[in-house]
């Protein structure tokens, strides 16, 4: 049996950088406003995994109203989510992540993001795809007000 999940996340810029995307620190003049570390890629990916096992979203499991999660490392959240996936008897087939940002440029960091995600999800590098796009200067990401991310996962029975 297979299951598919989709995730989406957005964070606006504010404060000082750097930012963390896909588990990788990226130099930028601004940071991302968030309760945790603001990693939109790992948040979208976590939501996709939770959706695939019909377990809600990261807001339910790691609420921003709980100080326990303030400044949380999203890689640790992702690992926790993946433990839940495995507890349901599933493993990752593949993940596809799309980062939507006018700035900063993500290309120099994509390989490191794929490696970090593959490590956290206990899978081969070939099962992880991360890509980035812009909105051609349209919308909040185009105006450099924030970053968005979508993720899709395919799970299979272990």
From Swiss-Prot:
Q: Which residues bind 4-CDP-2-C-methyl-D-erythritol 2-phosphate?
A: 9-11, 35-36, 57-59, 62-66, 101-107, 133-136, 140, 143
| Record keywords | Isoprene biosynthesis, Lyase, Metal-binding
Q: Which domain of life is it from?
A: Bacteria
- Name the site position(s) for Transition state stabilizer: 35, 134
Kindly give the Pfam families that the UniProt entry links to this protein: YgbB (PF02542)
Q: Name one GO biological process term.
A: isopentenyl diphosphate biosynthetic process, methylerythritol 4-phosphate pathway
InterPro entries per UniProt: MECDP_synthase (IPR003526), MECDP_synthase_CS (IPR020555), MECDP_synthase_sf (IPR036571)
Write down the EC number: 4.6.1.12
Cite a single GO MF annotation: 2-C-methyl-D-erythritol 2,4-cyclodiphosphate synthase activity
| Matching SUPFAM superfamilies | IpsF-like (SSF69765)
UniProt protein name: 2-C-methyl-D-erythritol 2,4-cyclodiphosphate synthase
| Catalytic activity reported | 4-CDP-2-C-methyl-D-erythritol 2-phosphate = 2-C-methyl-D-erythritol 2,4-cyclic diphosphate + CMP
Which pathway does the record list?
Isoprenoid biosynthesis; isopentenyl diphosphate biosynthesis via DXP pathway; isopentenyl diphosphate from 1-deoxy-D-xylulose 5-phosphate: step 4/6
Entry cofactors = a divalent metal cation
> What is this protein for, i.e. what is its function?
Involved in the biosynthesis of isopentenyl diphosphate (IPP) and dimethylallyl diphosphate (DMAPP), two major building blocks of isoprenoid compounds. Catalyzes the conversion of 4-diphosphocytidyl-2-C-methyl-D-erythritol 2-phosphate (CDP-ME2P) to 2-C-methyl-D-erythritol 2,4-cyclodiphosphate (ME-CPP) with a corresponding release of cytidine 5-monophosphate (CMP).
Name the PROSITE patterns for this protein.
ISPF (PS01350)
The EC class name is: lyase
Lineage of the organism: Bacteria, Pseudomonadati, Pseudomonadota, Gammaproteobacteria, Vibrionales
Q: What family does this belong to? A: Belongs to the IspF family.
* Residues at which a divalent metal cation binds: 9, 11, 43
Q: Which organism is it from?
A: Vibrio cholerae serotype O1 (strain ATCC 39315 / El Tor Inaba N16961)
Q: How is the cofactor bound?
A: Binds 1 divalent metal cation per subunit.
Q: Describe the protein's quaternary organization and the partners it interacts with.
A: Homotrimer.
